Amino acid sequence: MWVKLRDSGYTRTIQGLYHVLQRLGIYEKAPSKKKESEPSEWITGKYPGDKVQVDVKYVPKKCMSPDLQEKGERFYQYTAIDEYTRIRYTWFTNEHSTYMSSEFVKRLVKYYPFKIKTIQTDNGFKFTNRLSLQAFLKNKKTMFESTLEKLGIDYKVIKPHTPKQNGRVERSHKKDQERFYYKKVFYSLEDLRNRGKTWRKEYNNFPMRPLG
């Protein structure tokens, strides 16, 4: 239509023509097929300890000393962050497993000055067997899940492949990468733990946005 009108001397743009047709009720804009975007994160913690996000970060290989790299050593950072207070706890290990995850939780409950009601993680096997059909059908709990049960802590997992549901802890790991791991070299697990403890204190003292 616009091409024919233009050939007849019509001077408006195609967008202008559509606006005129819409006002006259001749052209109805097709409804958008784009789905409403999901929230960037699911923050539901209403009070200290209501929900704590937990995740594991691989310590960058380039941060390991040449000697550690030659030995094939790998280090991991366990991280917990309370959704309401944003208080964060970290612990560094040389393996990530359901055993280490349960050990991390035991340390976490001693660190926080408040009782933890719910812990939320991804679906990794270091936390849960929910993506293992055989284990799930047998209702076989991991050591991590059993530890949470013994401690009276509710357990929640995010949707598979949806890390933004654990957005607060994910973003904290980006800050680790930019401000802690950048241009650092660690010579042992003890070295990493000592410097990581100092960084944890600095992180928890960063100015935060008002709660709410």
Tell what function each PLM region has.
Residues 2-61, 123-125, 132-133, 139-145:
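Basic, flexible linker segments flanking DNA-binding modules
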